Amino acid sequence: MTVIIFLSVLLGTIILGVPVAFALLICGIALMLHLDFFNAQILAQQLVSGADSFSLMAIPFFILAGEIMNEGGLSKRIIDLPMKLVGHKRGGLGFVAILSAMIMASLSGSAVADTAAVAAMLLPMMKTTGYPIHRSAGLIGTAGIIAPIIPPSIPFIVFGVASGVSITKLFLAGIFPGVIMGCCLAILWRWQAKRLNLMTFSKATKQDLCFSFKNSVWALMLPVIIIGGFRSGIFTPTEAGVVATFYALIVSLFIYHELPLKHLPKVLLAAAKTTAVVMFLVASANVTGYLITVAELPTMLTILLEPLIENPTILLLVIMLAVFVIGMVMDLTPTVLILTPVLMPLVEEAGIDPVYFGVLFILNTSIGLITPPVGNVLNVITGVSKLPFDQAAKGIMPYLGMMIMLLLTFIFIPELILMPLQWIQ
């Protein structure tokens, strides 16, 4: 009965158009009433404690760093360098999109922000040079979901806080899978580009290449500083967010001179709005998570799936199928916040490495961002490309299929995630 009430209230409020954060709060109140211990004080305490975490402080700083990079010219220069490197090849703009998305993923950690930036700069160019727009939009959207995997990843921070898993280990574990995702996308795009008569650009001269590299080197130093810093223990992921913001601000103001001081309040306001949405979502999910634990839903799930605990691979397949279905109708962050406290006891009892599970979980929920009917990234590329939704969805299907195959590969070959993590550590 508890499960039915939980799902009915949650899905019912979302279908009615209630924002997810408020839907989670209403769901928490409904569970309290069902369990017959409604207490406004506990509700307020859980709401406040949900956002009261040192690790969560990384989120507003990385969001602010991303806003500064977009306004301060760093994103533009990051795209210019891959253009000079591979823009002359057949289907070169596709390779530029993949490389740009991977580099920007290592700066902001947001799939929606990265996709919007790359799509706004490259899709018009791809359209005018004869690229099939639905395939181009699909490629850029899929490249955008590399952002939650390559550090610094906001979803990894959310999962780490919700599960108690080391955020630093999650960051390090995401590097190699993120690179594999980019390489697989490039291979698929190359195969598609060979079948299309796409316009090529003239090859950049060495002088142009050197100038582009020199112009973008300050932007490219940011991921090196961030990853190198928490890898060597100089600062935590939270402190890395502060460093990223400060560095992006200095470069934008005093080196590239593209962020006037009068525009800074607008940048701060945009970052504050995004942060408020994310943090209220986290706080509301903490209320629901607390009541899920009180209602012993994780214990019920463990009992239900107990026969599969002896076979972790089958258990992972069942969990990932459920997460994939939920990810089709729910955004990444609420999916992580709702399911993590339910699934982690089961994962731990089955002896599955929590860092490995975290990477699979975030990859799966990221795939949900490009999966119809709700995918946020799919909606972004639909808006930027001005394609009908069904055409954008059609264009993304080959890449979506490839990402699902990659997820299955990681499930059956966990060493692809665990061994590189051991090497990096």
Swiss-Prot record:
Keywords: Cell inner membrane, Cell membrane, Membrane, Transmembrane, Transmembrane helix, Transport. The keyword S-adenosyl-L-methionine does not apply. The chain crosses the membrane at residues 3-23, 24-44, 54-74, 93-113, 139-159, 169-189, 217-237, 241-261, 275-295, 312-332, 334-354, 355-375, 399-419. The keyword Ligase does not apply. GO terms for cellular component: plasma membrane. Belongs to the TRAP transporter large permease family. This is Putative TRAP transporter large permease protein HI_1029. It comes from Haemophilus influenzae (strain ATCC 51907 / DSM 11121 / KW20 / Rd).
